[in-house]
Amino acid sequence: EIKESVMLKIGLLSDTHAWWDDKYAEYFSECDEIWHAGDIGSVEIAEKLAAFRPFRAVYGNIDGQEIRKMFPQVNRFTVDGAEVLIKHIGGYPGKYDPSIIGSLMTRPPKLFISGHSHILKVKYDKTLDMLHINPGAAGMSGFHKVRTMVRFVIDNGAFKDLEVIELAG
């Protein structure tokens, strides 16, 4: 039996810190799913995103008990042939956070997503044969000068058409 590729378009953001921007919905209108890498900041933001598209998320260090009840600290799942792991505080290739390095080394996913640093980073880890994405921060809280999000396509386990979206102000 031939399994057809789904070709999913993913909208990825992090560190909204309770900040809503209508641009989230605008830029993610073509996406099949929205993923959030933590520090959502409010239940309202999570609910707005979840009402808009199928929504996967993790909680971050600033998220309160309500959000921690709604989402896990680590979200590991497989979608269109790609195993994905999302954790808010995760580090990046060459400098993974001690809290996740064991999982990454033992069973590396194809895609590891983290947030927390407010620094946009897309880097391939050759050692683990794994792509790492930190979409930067979409909210207003923090030192970052530019608010960013990411869109990409998963096609039969491969990642392509990655776009960085810069939000004004």
Show which residues each predicted segment covers.
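N-terminal active-site segment of His-dependent metallophosphoesterases
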Residues: I2-F55, D63-G81, K145-T148, I154
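Active-site neighborhood of phospho(di)ester-bond hydrolases with catalytic His/Asp-centered motifs
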Residues: L12-S14, E33-D39, R56-N61, I86-H88, ...
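Short, solvent-exposed coil/turn elements at secondary-structure transition points
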Residues: T16, N61, G90-Y92, A138, ...
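Short active-site segment of divalent metal-dependent hydrolases/proteases
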Residues: A18, S42, G91, I119, ...
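Hydrophobic anchor at the start of a short beta-strand
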Residues: F55, V84, L162
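Conserved beta-sheet core of the metallophosphoesterase superfamily
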Residues: R56, K95-A158
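Active-site-proximal segments of metal-dependent phosphoesterases and phosphodiesterases across multiple
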Residues: D63-P108, M140-F143
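Short, solvent-exposed aromatic-acidic interface loops
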Residues: L162-G169
